[in-house]
């Protein structure tokens, strides 16, 4: 997504978020600020997928200068470089990490990609335990113990079934992961085998087989939902890591223990009794 600009004619000048901006030619995947009636923020999104560009105007509480901020009405004035152009911008950057445009662009991509991995990872940590507690047997269900099964005498059976993939070599798994993930990431960043120009964060095309981004209004809202759930998933994964170190149990078992005896099974009780290495 390119830098936010005021939508106006070539060579003219117009105002957006209290600043005068010279109009330049819009680029693909561009979010254009358009002044709405009665001071309401209206956004125009341009979505390019190698086909004809589609533009849509949306009134959204998540974009623009009048968007929802991190402390609501008590947030104060957000930094000038956080204009509400991108999804998940709540006007909070006390460390100034977004002040440099190039660093900001890099960090945006890193956050979205890590959010997606965290959402998949959180599901992978929780779902096997849920199945195991409901009588479905497919090998080790605790997420941080499952991978170690490959070092056992019988190796690792995917989903607990030797008919699927029976893995006995950590090097073979590593090689497959590098090849498969490297190919997909290369496709995403380079724009496909023909090098078509795409947005590396939201490439669309084969990465959107259900056509969820076909409607620009819905696409803008989905971006916000994705980053919000992704941030929650990253915190969840951090919590799972801490739980594994402190309790030696998976998240579902920890939850069950807490519900059964909340007085003796809680963060404070574990923190005060935790001894590293034991």
UniProtKB/Swiss-Prot annotation:
Residues that hold chlorophyll a 3 according to the record: 149, 159, 226
Positions binding chlorophyll b 4 in this chain are 177, 188
Q: GO CC terms for this protein? A: chloroplast thylakoid membrane; photosystem I; photosystem II
* An MF annotation (GO) of this entry: chlorophyll binding
**Which residues are chlorophyll a 5-binding?**
225, 243
User: What's its job?
Assistant: The light-harvesting complex (LHC) functions as a light receptor, it captures and delivers excitation energy to photosystems with which it is closely associated.
Residues with PTM N2-acetylarginine: 46
Amino-acid positions noted as binding chlorophyll a 1 in the UniProt annotation, renumbered to this chain: 92, 98, 111, 231
User: Binding residues for chlorophyll b 5, per the UniProt record?
Assistant: 177, 274
Binding residues for chlorophyll b 1: 70
Q: Which residues bind chlorophyll a 6?
A: 258, 267
Name-wise, this protein is Chlorophyll a-b binding protein type 2 member 1A, chloroplastic
Which organism does this sequence originate in?
Answer: Pinus sylvestris
Instruction: Enumerate the residues binding chlorophyll a 2.
Output: 114
Residue ranges annotated as transmembrane are 112-132, 164-184, 232-252
List positions binding chlorophyll b 2.
116, 165, 194
Q: Mind telling me how this protein is modified after translation?
A: Photoregulated by reversible phosphorylation of its threonine residues.
Using the UniProt record, give the first listed, main subcellular location. Answer: plastid
Localization (cell)? Plastid, Chloroplast thylakoid membrane
